[in-house]
Amino acid sequence: MNLKEFLDIKSEEYNNKAFIENDPIQIPHKFKTKEDIEISAFLTATISWGNRKSIINSSKKMMGLLENDPHQFIINHSDKDLKSLLTFVHRTFNGYDFIQFVKSLKNIYCNHGGLEMVFFNNMKDNSLHNSIHQLKNIFFEIEHLKRTRKHVSDPFKGSAAKRINMFLRWMVRNDNNGVDFGLWKSIPTSYLSIPLDVHTGNVARKLGLLSRKQNDAKALIELDKKLRELDPIDPVKYCLLYTS
């Protein structure tokens, strides 16, 4: 059995609905409309560090503070509504960051056509690295707190942008197994990058897919190249790499 055959088998094992039960992706699965799914997914992915139980609990609190109607809250919130978000905290992401995210998302949905269009309009060189870079620029084009900038990664600054790439996988990829949503038909799955972190990097090195020691933007480019050789159409299907 070669590496591709091994990874394909493992991908089928992991990529099923049973995975949802203990994963943060369960949060956007609670919603029905496109905007609610993508907003809840983006916010959940943003705070996805730490153990999964903590991430899920914090994401549920986020959605509760948005009255379980995230798109409507973001578009129609009042200043009084925003004050209620100050109680939120997950690790270093606090209520002030949450308020900034709501304001920035409102700008994106009201003035830029929504999250999908931000990524679609800035695709370049068969990847979404430039789209992620431009997302950060657009996200903080309005008046903002400097402290909140650290919560939106930028591959052009050397980051592997794990959480945004995880969010993009959820939105773009669709293999009919009911895990990822496949909501964004405008973006090819071939442009996706794997969510790279310490665990992913270590597994990739053991499999001979990655030589670079750091888990950064350069490592992601190297890993992208290898995974696209294995599957040019769906390179991020290899769940084994990032399922611990």
Language-model segments: residues:
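Charge-rich, intrinsically disordered N-terminal extensions
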Residues: M1-S48, K53-M63
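A cross-kingdom feature marking charged/low-complexity
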Residues: N2-K30, K83-G113, I233-Y238
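Short, charged/polar micro-motifs that form catalytic or ligand-binding hotspots
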Residues: H29, T33, A41-R52, F88-T92, ...
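Non-catalytic DNA-binding core/recognition domains of DNA-processing enzymes
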Residues: W49-E67, I75-D79, R91-K106, T200
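A Lys/Arg-rich helix-loop hairpin that forms a DNA/phosphate-binding surface
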Residues: E67-D81, M123, Q214-A217
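Hydrophobic, aromatic-lined core segments that form the binding pocket/scaffold
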Residues: F88-P188, L192-H199, E222, P232-V236
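Catalytic cores of DNA base-excision repair glycosylases
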Residues: L192, L207-P235
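Conserved small/polar residues in nucleotide/adenosyl-binding loops
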Residues: Y242-T243
